Amino acid sequence: MTVVYEDNHIIVVNKTASEIVQADKTGDTPLSETVKQYLKEKYQKPGNVFLGVTHRLDRPVSGLVIFAKTSKELTRLNEMFRTSEVKKTYWAVVKNAPQEPEGELVHFLVRNEKQNKSYAYDKEVPNSKKAILHYRLIGHSENYYCLLYTSPSPR
């Protein structure tokens, strides 16, 4: 685990691809538990350590995750994410070039709890949630393309 930033209120860590942020049905150790153990050892805290999960990244995604070290900070950060005061930006390396160098993708997502997966559809289907993604091609090599994308929707 790599700590990128830490103060009295938050800790920001680099999540590697394949790690989970919160516990799920797989039983794999989540990053949140690894961070709790780190804080417990670093500050020699007896008993339970508070750590609030402010957002998640999917298992196959790597990137920075912000955890709240106090319940008060968790409330503040949750409000900032809820009101889009925090702007999430993603970089993706893909093998196929996008049709346009810049654009918007709209899909409808359905979560399958039994499979622990989500599925994307081009048209609205029962129990789906609309997801919007804005992307821009920012570079490429001979075999790969780098996209910068943002999402105004929480999905």
Residue ranges and their predicted role:
Residues 1-151:
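RNA pseudouridine synthases
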Residues 153-155:
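Positively charged, low-complexity/disordered segments
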